[in-house]
Amino acid sequence: MAKDEVGHNFLARLGKTRLRPGGKKATDWLIANGGFSQDKKVLEVACNMGTTAIGLAKQFGCHIEGVDLDENALAKAQANIEANGLQEKIHVQRANAMKLPFEDESFDIVINEAMLTMLPVEAKKKAIAEYFRVLKPNGLLLTHDVMLVGNDHQTILENMRKAINVTVTPLTKDGWKGIFQESGFRNVDTFSGEMTLLSPKGMIYDEGIFGTLKIIRNAMKAENREQFKRMFKTFNDPEHKLHFIAVCSQK
């Protein structure tokens, strides 16, 4: 494969199903704070392979609309939805987060994980404004991203960009809270910690022992080894630790 393969696509190819910076633990915090129930209408932006949407539909029986720009991810999501018999609960389509194809005040909950980090600040604001638009009054926005800590932000950003082959723009905790508040959201609550995406403990928690062994086995293949080692080293660097932030905001 190409050496410049985008990080989340690379990890998915290795067999990783949880592709969020705080892993299942952060996603579970969002779900616990999201007020999900059978009668709620949910939008997942950047639904990827449908892992979170499928979990929500199974747990709560809610109807979920999923959007993503990646046709390959959507094809995998559709296959996963059908394999779980959830075609009546989940619908996915290709759409841009900054121009959502939905009417105003259409959803009770919008969930968007590991995407806003990838956008420049102005694009972040456009996407968040769209989430605000399609949410019903008092609706909840649930997000999950990379958070900057410490003082050496430039080194962290450079290391991340080299590791995942994508230009990223994570923010500090105050930066994330501020961008949601500036967009009109209130009651902004956060949960944060060290990134667990590629930590041994986090991988086992997210993927199980056998899933983790499968990922490691694939990672050690000659064509994957260099990029995996680079990502593993960056994501577990003790001097430039990467953090996640999960945010629950109300319209």
UniProtKB/Swiss-Prot annotation:
- Single GO BP term: methylation
State if Methyltransferase is listed as a keyword: yes
In which domain of life is the source organism classified?
Answer: Bacteria
| Keyword Methyltransferase set for record | yes
Pfam name, any one: Methyltransf_25
Sorted keywords for this record are:
Methyltransferase, Transferase
Q: Which Gene3D superfamilies match?
A: Vaccinia Virus protein VP39
- UniProt-listed InterPro entries: Erg6_SMT_methyltransf, Methyltransf_25, SAM-dependent_MTases_sf
Q: Which SUPFAM superfamilies match?
A: S-adenosyl-L-methionine-dependent methyltransferases (SSF53335)
Molecular function (GO) terms for this protein are:
methyltransferase activity
Protein name according to UniProt: Uncharacterized protein HI_0095
Source organism: Haemophilus influenzae (strain ATCC 51907 / DSM 11121 / KW20 / Rd)
